[in-house]
């Protein structure tokens, strides 16, 4: 009987955590759960998703005139909805500019072919693209990486290691961190929605954040800066994307770690594999919004000159790769 009750309690705890994960996702993507200021993120997410689908169509090797008509019309509706929204000023102007430039290229490509798209993109929508800056969105030529750049990238990747010995007297500048974040924003994301967010803490705030993470014992007190990576769930749609925050946030985090290393900083990945109760404690302590999913923590700083790092032996590529017939 004791074994049965223990099994029952374990199952209950498991399903409860799954339910709380699902509830956060559901509440974050449900328009009725969002206030006016937060709901504009949903419109922005629709705009990004729609213009990026059109961008992909513009890059297809066999251009098909009139492609994506439903997506183009949807983008126009979303942009008009944003114009009427009381919190429209909160929308990322860069993403809106990309949408305008994409519509402009779509119009110009068809005009050059003499293909009539007035039923898809009528003249009364001209204000949406006529002042767009070419190159802000749409398509561009692809530039392969030069061999020297590939060698430099390999050196960055192979030399990166998890640093746990920091110079506690030095804290990275905001400019250095933002330069790394700017590079990390080049990471892939579903339909280019770019849901990754960061929360940066130093001093006592960094130590407060670390107190909720169990993997920094013995060195956490020497970490001068903590970066919490999250994913903004408001930009996702439907249950099929319920794991996308972790996927996109993970890719962003990896590129951020490489970028920090390239900036001459040391960093250590601190996992956030916790239950929702511990997650709640961190959120309350450092004010992370309910609609953001915590992906991981990163301890960051200048590496100690005499510090050591683990060898961390890696599997061979041949051990993990399989090739289809």
Predicted regions, residues:
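Acidic, surface-exposed loops and disordered segments
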Residues: 1-325
